[in-house]
Design a protein with these regions (language model features):
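Generic structural marker for isolated residues within well-ordered, non-membrane alpha-helices
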Residues: 95
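A structural signal for small-residue-enriched, beta-sheet-centric alpha/beta enzyme cores
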Residues: 1-75, 79-90, 99-407
């Protein structure tokens, strides 16, 4: 596997465009489009929040009931959530506009929205945005990058990644982009993720690969514990790499899954590290667990602990908060057997041994915790399973950003 420059346009046959449609923001792009030269197999995972935005309902129907998908239209600024039948109508009108200008069937158009809940979409601006983007569709790296910028809301940086692998003597590319900074606690931030590949793979295995991988990537991140109404991850495969089609769980499938995991994990970590107001990526590894599920529950409990997140912001080795968060997670373990370590680019040090603090240097701990990426490793000595979760520190700016979000 080789990491390359680019995102959603890295794979053969995929193009992207973006524009400033004036949906909510001024003087910045707020719409993006992804287009495949040929119809794609489509897979998707969506929010588990009972309150589902109109685009989530629309895309779920396209992914599970349509034979193919060929375009994705994304807007930032307004979520099109809690908008009733009118909101669903806007999804259809968006798809009908794409059908008119690109000749794609309505049920092969995916839509996604992110932004303020409860506001109706300015559909005329959406349609005008589509008109503006179609002539701009290109397969170059820059177009993909600009699209990744256009879907941002409170994000401070765009997020994209791409890799190539060899399958059956053919080069297969997987690329993706995402947005997410606040309301990030997927269970499938506001999290939108779009992954494209030129791999030839059956729709069934494409969906299975995505559903399984989401559990270990996007579902293992949290910024603020809020599961969005709009969380969506879409994976499109157009087959233009011309590799032997992957129709069974063989070595080719495993290679594809490894590359997909790299793309999704990279995007997930980019979202966690770009949490609203965040200054540090906070990674929690639980090792020595009895089961992977036990390790997942423990690690996610720690990254969602507000007191722990504040301690990371303060570069404070307040290990009691970590042990406390593990204790109320609901997962059984013996606290008197836990070893805890902090690690970063500045070094690694043990903080507790068998549930009791060791003699460590607070100054050294502060130095380790002052890096932009910090890891806490807890060994619970019950087995050989492990899991990793990603979050961020909690700062004053998080409150400021969200207090002013609608203004």
């Amino acid at each position: 596997m080789k990491q390359i420059t680019g995102g959603v346009t890295a794979a053969k046959g995929f193009q992207a465009a973006s524009t400033a449609a004036g949906i909510k923001y001024k003087d910045r792009k707020d719409m993006a489009m992804i287009y495949s030269e040929v119809p794609c197999k489509a897979a998707g995972t969506f929010t588990t929040n009972i309150v589902k935005a109109a685009p989530v309902k629309w895309d779920h129907n396209v992914v599970y009931n349509s034979k193919a998908a060929q375009a994705v239209v994304v807007n930032a600024g307004i979520a099109n959530a809690c908008t009733g039948e009118e909101g669903m109508g806007y999804c259809r009108q968006t798809a009908e506009k794409v059908e008119k200008v690109l000749g794609i069937a309505v049920d092969e158009v995916l839509v996604a929205s992110t932004g303020v809940i409860g506001m109706q979409l300015p559909i005329d601006r959406i349609c005008n945005g589509i008109d503006a983007m179609v002539p701009l569709l290109k397969g170059d790296t820059g177009s993909g990058t600009e699209a990744s910028k256009a879907i941002m809301t409170t994000d401070t940086k765009n997020k994209e990644v791409a890799v190539t692998i060899e399958i059956g003597g053919k080069t297969v590319t997987i690329g993706g982009m995402c947005k997410g900074s606040g309301m990030i606690h997927p269970n499938m931030c506001t999290m939108l993720s779009f992954v494209t590949t030129d791999a030839a793979i059956s729709k069934e295995l494409l969906q299975e690969a995505l559903s399984a991988d989401v559990q270990d990537t996007y579902n293992m991140i949290s910024v603020d514990g809020d599961t969005s109404t709009n969380d969506t991850c879409l994976l499109l495969a157009n087959g233009l790499a011309e590799n032997p089609e992957i129709t069974e769980k063989n070595a080719d499938y495993e290679e594809f899954c490894k590359a997909l995991n790299f793309v999704n994990e990279t995007l997930a970590k980019k979202m966690a590290g770009d949490g609203e107001g965040a200054t540090a990526l906070f990674e929690v590894k639980i090792i020595g667990a009895e089961s992977k599920e036990q390790a997942k529950v423990l690690s996610k409990s720690v990254i969602t602990s507000s007191l722990t997140k504040v301690a990371i912001y303060g570069h404070d080795a307040n290990w009691g908060r970590i042990l406390c968060a593990m204790g109320y997670s609901g997962a059984a373990f013996d606290p008197e057997k836990v070893d805890l370590f902090f690690e970063s680019a500045a070094g690694k040090m043990q903080i507790i041994k068998n549930g009791v603090a060791v003699d460590y240097s607070e100054e050294e701990a502060t130095r380790i915790l002052s890096e932009p990426a910090v890891t806490a490793i807890a060994d619970i000595k019950m087995g050989n399973a492990s899991a990793t979760a990603w979050g961020c520190d909690l700062t004053y700016d998080y409150v400021k950003i969200n207090a002013d979000y609608r203004s």
